[in-house]
Every structure is written in structure tokens, then in C-alpha cells.
Amino acid sequence: MKIYTKTGDKGFTSLIGGTRVAKHHIRIESYGTVDELNSYIGLICDQDIALHDKQILKQIQDRLFTIGSSLASDPEKSKMIIPDLHLTDIELLEKEMDMMNADLPELRHFILPGGSNAISFCHIARCVCRRAERITVQLAGESTVDEKVNIYLNRLSDYLFTLARKIANDNKIPENQWIPRV
């Protein structure tokens, strides 16, 4: 299978189902941003973090491929069976956050990104996740998007924030608290 097809050379690409759209179409922007997020999560996995966290992140990467496939499909034409996102996927993120938060100091200030590469990559992924969520919410206003996708992305950004705090705590790295000037 060739990687290049030359069919996108004029600025158009195909959705799953065959519909041709401009490469700047919001549906392309949505799944492209999810793909970008998945790459950053891979970067977090490459850091020296707890094995359990890596295992959860690998599950998240799998779910992001599910989301990307769903977003890359023309809801009117796709006959391909796309894996579904389940409520249990969202519940897993919530359960993991609850477990991490049980061991973290109470959050009293905003946290500035930084402290280590792993922490910073979590914050970058969190920001990309928020962007993916904004784009898919916009897409949902124009086309069919499974509502669990936006819920998952919302929880995932919270999970990534909490994971950044956990990594700081695990490595005894003080959190960079934002103390506003008055």
C-alpha cells in the first residue's frame, strides 16, 4: 500500500464513505486535532512515568483512534463499521482522576505548566484536547457527532491536568502555582 495517493494535491480529501471535502473543512480540522492530541499523548508515554499511567494512556490513545474514525466518517454515507465510544470509557477517566486526586494536595491556586518534560507535555496535551473539544462542539452544531465524543474530550482534558499534578507529586516536584499580582 502506498502512503501517497496524490488525490489530495488540490486541497481536497475524502471522508470515510467517499465524500470529498476541502482540507480546511471543520470535520478534517476536528479529527486532525484529535490525531495531534494522540501524538502528544504518545510523547507523554515516552517519558519516565508510572507504568499504570502509561497503560491508561495507551487505552486513551486507542479511544482517540475510535473518536478520529468517527469524526472522519460522513454520517450520511459511511457503511464502514466504526468502533463505538462507550460510557465506560468516560467512567474510566473519572475513576482514574478520583484515584489520583485522593493522593494530591488540595488545589488552591491555578497551576502554571512546567516542572519537567512529562508535566509540560501533559499540559500541552490538555490544551490540544481543549482545542479538539471546541472544534468538535462546533462540528456538532453543523453535523452529527456522537455526544459521548465531546463528553470524553471534556473529561480527558481534566484527566491530563490531574495526571500532570500526579506526575509532579510522584516526583516530588513542587507545583508552579499562579499567585496573581494585586
What function would you assign to each model-found segment?
Residues M1-V182:
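Phosphate/pyrophosphate-binding loop motifs in nucleotide- or prenyl diphosphate-using proteins
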